Regions:
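Selective transmembrane helix interface/packing segments
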Residues: 2-458
């Protein structure tokens, strides 16, 4: 690891012929689309298994063509535009949301940076391109996609989409800061912002081991950035009908759905690159097989890691309930941002100590990472525990109905009952009271001690 940030050697990029660049761009697009089609079916299958159902099984073998059938159905539906919508922005919003989702994959490495594979006789890297500030490019592109959601909510001319757009904007602002801090810790420790160089620095240990807090922070923020459960507040069906895309139909609605799943694949690919060794084979495989990281095999390891993270998305959706909006904001501003800033300071300190050739830097990083990871998990558990305590609090019984509360008799509403009418005292008790005897009704239970014979003497 280089002790200081320096310009990386990216000479292997920019030398491919134009037709090879087009082929690699088409491959990146096809990788995203095929992964999205598979992920939709995979999600429906996994959720069905969790709910003891069968899931899609009609179109294609094992229902694998269900996503393709749904896409064709959406494109053939009638395209409606509401009267109060700003038509130009209304049509532009799905495009603004979808295009940035495809851009980040351009700097993700699928294999070693060296010329490892041959395509039609040309040796080339398994990456479309790389930049000295590739991760800043990914962070900037992720921020642009939110404009599509905000514009969709504003241009629809409806209340529910507007609220969904505002929620999405607030959620992005709250979680983008913690995501940037998680990225910055990786930059500091690896000494590079190039994606290929970050993967190269993980040859001995993945950053999920060295930077566990950064990994946890990024996983939480990537769920918030993609508006997935349990952080899907911008499209909460319970209070916003459908959220920002309520007024959309046909291919425009399909573009929003496509952008959501492409973003899931993109953030999973970024997590794989930053923390899971990228295209590198897992430790047992790379130890016993020297050729595991050569040829086309890195593409397999990269795809498997991305699919595992996509399964994590699906697992969260099937197990965790949607959090309240105030809990979402509290987690972002009071937990993630403070923890990310403290962790960033610790990583910067360890980086400075490593530059001075101190040996205890890794130990301090491990200890500090473990402590902060436990604190972060405890904060998250406390939020859900507080929610459970509130649900278990005893509900106060409503006050008894008073028919004369307003000064005049009022009939009871449905669910209300009139207070019991006091029974008339028996004649013997009335005579005793007049003669100065004890009041048995006030000393005993309500209604007095009566029998049928005395009650008939009233």
């Amino acid at each position: 690891m280089s002790p200081y940030l320096a310009a990386e050697d990216l000479s292997m990029f920019g030398t491919d012929p134009w037709w090879l660049v087009v082929i690699k761009a088409v491959f990146c697009f096809a990788f995203l689309m095929v992964t999205v089609l598979f992920s939709i079916v995979w999600e429906r299958k996994v959720v069905a298994w969790m709910q003891l159902r069968i899931g899609p099984n009609r179109h294609g073998p094992w229902g694998m063509l269900q996503s393709l059938a749904d896409g064709i159905k959406l494109m053939l539906k009638e395209d409606l535009i509401v009267k109060r919508a700003d038509k130009a922005v209304y049509v532009l919003a799905p495009i603004v949301a979808a295009i940035p989702a495809f851009m980040a994959i351009a700097v993700i490495p699928f294999g070693p940076a060296g010329n490892e594979v041959s395509i039609f006789g040309h040796r080339t890297a398994m990456q479309l391109t790389d930049l000295p500030i590739a991760m800043l490019f990914i962070l900037a592109v992720a921020s642009v996609g939110i404009y599509g959601i905000v514009l969709a909510g504003w241009s629809s001319g409806s209340t529910y989409p507007l609220l969904g757009g505002l929620r999405s904007c607030a959620q992005m602002i709250s979680y983008e800061i913690a995501m940037g801090a998680a990225f910055a810790s990786v930059f500091l420790y690896s000494g590079s912002m190039s994606t290929s160089e970050i993967v190269a620095q993980q040859d001995d240990r993945w950053y999920i081991v060295l930077l566990p807090v950064s990994f946890i922070l990024y996983v939480v923020t990537m769920i918030g950035e993609t508006n997935r459960a349990p952080f899907d507040m911008p499209e909460s069906e319970g209070d916003l009908v459908g959220g920002f895309n309520t007024e959309y139909s046909s291919i425009k609605f399909a573009m929003f759905m496509l952008a959501e799943y492409v973003n899931m694949v993109t953030v999973s690919a970024v997590a794989t690159t930053l923390f899971l060794g990228g295209w590198r084979a897992p430790w047992p495989v790379s130890t016993f097989w020297e050729g595991a990281n050569h040829g086309w095999w890195p593409l397999l390891w990269f795809t498997v890691k991305v699919q595992l993270l996509l399964f994590f998305f699906i697992w969260l959706r099937g197990t965790l309930p949607r959090v309240r909006y105030d809990q979402l904001m509290k987690l972002g501003w009071k937990v993630l941002i403070p923890v990310s800033l403290v962790w960033l300071m610790l990583v910067a300190t360890v980086r400075a100590l490593r530059n001075e050739n101190y040996d205890f830097a890794d130990i301090a990083l491990y200890i500090g990472g473990g402590v902060l990871a436990l604190l972060l998990l405890s904060f998250v558990v406390d939020i859900f525990r507080e929610k459970g305590k509130r649900a278990e609090e005893p509900v106060e019984e409503p006050a008894a109905f008073d028919p004369m509360a307003g000064g005049f008799p009022v009939p009871p509403m449905p669910g209300q009952e009139l207070p019991p009418v006091p029974r008339r005292r028996p004649r013997r008790e009335r005579e005793l009271i007049v003669s100065g005897g004890p009041d048995t009704q006030s000393d005993g239970p309500a209604g007095g001690s009566t029998d049928g014979k005395e009650a008939s003497d009233g």
